[in-house]
A protein has these predicted regions:
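Conserved structured core elements
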Residues: 32, 60-64, 115, 212-215, ...
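Histidine-centered nuclease catalytic patch
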Residues: 455-488, 505
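Short, amphipathic alpha-helical segments that act as regulatory/interfacial helices
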Residues: 67, 122, 222, 343-351, ...
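Short Cys/His-centered divalent metal-binding micro-motifs
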Residues: 485-515
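A cross-family structural signal marking well-folded subdomains
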Residues: 2-25, 270-417
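Basic- and aromatic-enriched surface patches that contact anionic nucleotides/nucleic acids
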Residues: 2-293, 333-334, 366-373, 377, ...
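Intrinsically disordered, low-complexity N-proximal targeting/linker segments that flank membranes
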Residues: 374-465, 473
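Short conserved micro-motifs at the rims of enzyme active sites and ligand-binding pockets
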Residues: 91, 218-220, 297-299, 357-358, ...
């Protein structure tokens, strides 16, 4: 963590960086604070620890070194505060010590830089006990060595006592009357304690306060000085910005509940098997139904009350969109969705239609949109801008009109499918996998429905993905052939993939499955393996199989696109 700050960059920061109409030059305030003044502000609730900071993680030894630096007159860096009337999500306690609330309507100073140092000083002053990894740490147990010898001792302040030496607790030095030490120690040692107390309480802590900066700029300041330029995410900023204790709204907790559910609320992303949906997508869903715009700067303009009011409507629209994808499009898991951005557009659609069941015509057009997005790799760049355009497509569908698409965007060439390498991160491949999932593929051996799961679909080697012509078979028998083509991929259960097929030739394992599954021909149809492709597989002709299956896939995709 940096302990200093380039105030030049701060003085040049303007509100123009945030969504405001009239840029105003912002100027930080530099001043010193004494120990007593600093901790009086904490005890009165004026200084707070925002939750986008790390928890208190310093070891006792680090805290001892900090006190040691103060006693030796070393600089310990600058503390930076953001003074505002914004109510942010902040830590309520340090260890077992409860922090006071800020009086309603008062300014509060959030620590942007120096949280670990200030918390260390406060923990020592209060004698706080903290439980960490099952071990209790008592900050009263940081000591000044009264027999300190600069020639042999590295530090004045230590966490472990040596036999035969005199020590005094830093906590006691700060909190007990001086008379106590004159009664307990020799005159010389008591005078030492008095000198140490004076050094601590009279130390000038360098502080910079940025007052009434917009939250977006305060967060940018935090990012630049604390994380090497790594910006806080929009979600982290909105967690801080939308926190409302009176309404019991904590965005971080609400997102966890949305993802994992609770004992009272069973509907959640995990139960729907859409648990891979990120915080950023959820933020964009809120912005979509609130503003019909999803840029980061748009999200940051949403007021706390508006965001909270739109949280439940967003959830309703989101789950209606997920239900549509699962039931109408038959895509059972989020891992197969070409781009999560389609959820934002669909949530927008269902919010605008009050989550009503779409008409048959609307279903066809929404399905067309879904496949158009993936097959044209629509969100490969400029997602935020393109989503705004896609809301217009949703508006057209709502009003019974056909969205505008270029003719070339509604045609799939089977040759491209023949040549496309399989990748779980490729939207084009994912669209084909969605098509395969739509067929409700059956198990080769039993004709039972294949159960798909996000955990088995993450990477190309995951259990649900099966190379119809096994990779090991091709490597041993046809080294010149590429097994990793999308047209060679089927969705089957992991057990059959690993234990029943292995590296067998298709002709061999299909013959075995046929003895136990009299419906194997129909089973293979659910994988878009039509008669011509099946004949090629039964004669182990990989080239013809890929060609014929690519044609079957292209035909089915073109039906979706021409809805």
């Amino acid at each position: 963590m940096k302990h200093g700050l380039n105030t030049e960059f701060m003085s040049e920061t303007t509100v123009a960086a945030a969504p405001q109409n009239n840029p105003v030059l912002l100027q930080p305030d530099n001043h010193d604070k004494k120990y007593e003044a600093l901790f009086l502000d904490i005890d009165s609730g004026q200084i707070k620890l925002p939750m986008f900071q790390r928890e208190f993680v310093w070891e006792k030894e680090q805290s001892a070194k900090l006190i040691d630096s103060i006693l030796k007159g070393f600089p310990i860096g600058t503390f930076i505060f953001w003074k505002t009337r914004e109510e942010l999500r902040s830590y309520k306690e340090i260890g077992y010590h409860k922090l006071p609330e800020t009086p309603k309507g008062d300014y509060v100073q959030y620590i942007l830089d120096g949280q670990q140092r200030i918390t260390s000083l406060y923990a020592i002053r209060k004698g706080i006990r903290i439980s960490k990894d099952g071990v209790e740490i008592d900050y009263k147990d940081i000591f000044i060595n009264l027999d300190y010898n600069p020639a042999t001792d590295e530090q004045v302040v230590v966490t472990e006592k040596e036999e035969g030496k005199k020590y005094v607790s830093v906590h006691d030095v700060l909190c007990k009357p001086l008379g106590t030490f004159y009664r307990t120690y020799t005159q010389e040692m008591a005078e030492q304690v008095e000198a140490y107390k004076s050094k601590l309480t009279s130390y000038d802590f360098s502080t910079i306060t940025i007052k009434d900066y917009p939250i977006e700029i305060a967060c940018e300041v935090f990012s630049r000085i604390n994380t090497g330029g790594k910006a806080l995410t929009v979600f982290e900023i909105m967690v801080a910005k939308t926190y409302d204790e009176t309404k019991n709204f904590d965005l971080a907790e609400r997102f966890e509940m949305l993802r994992d559910g609770t004992d009272e609320e069973k509907e959640c992303l995990t139960a729907a098997r859409f648990e891979t949906i990120s915080e950023s997508i959820i933020m964009q869903c809120v912005a979509a139904i609130t503003l019909s715009a999803v840029r980061s700067r748009d999200i940051l303009t949403i007021r706390r009350e508006t965001f909270i009011a739109n949280w439940e409507p967003m959830k309703a629209a989101l789950f209606t969109a997920i239900d549509f994808i699962r039931s109408e499009l038959r895509v059972p898991v989020s891992q197969l969705v070409p781009y999560p951005g389609v959820l934002i557009a669909l949530a927008y659609f269902f919010h605008k239609t009050s989550n009503q069941k779409p008409s048959n015509e609307q279903v066809r057009r929404l399905e067309q949109y879904f496949y158009w997005v993936g097959l044209n790799e629509h969100y490969s760049s400029g997602t935020e801008t393109k989503l705004a355009e896609d809301f217009n497509k949703m508006d057209a569908i709502i009003t019974g009109k056909a969205p505008d698409y270029a003719n070339t965007e509604l045609q799939v060439d089977p040759k491209r499918i023949e040549e496309t390498w399989f990748s779980t991160g490729n939207a084009y491949c994912k669209s084909i996998l969605c098509l395969l999932a739509y067929q409700q593929p059956k198990s080769f051996d039993t004709n039972g429905v294949v159960i798909l799961d996000n955990s088995n679909l993450k990477i190309a080697t995951s259990r649900n993905y099966h190379h119809f012509f096994p990779k090991n078979y091709l490597e041993e028998n046809h080294k010149d052939k590429n097994p990793n083509l999308i047209a060679n991929i089927t969705l089957i259960d992991g057990y059959s993939n690993k234990h029943r097929i292995g590296k067998k030739a298709p002709s061999e394992y299909l013959a075995k499955f046929a003895t136990g599954n009299p419906s194997l021909h129909a089973t293979l149809q659910t994988h878009l393996i039509k008669d011509a492709a099946l004949l090629a597989a039964q004669s182990d002709d990989y080239g013809i199989f890929i060609q014929q299956r690519a044609q079957a896939i292209a035909l089915a995709l073109n039906v979706k696109l021409l809805s």
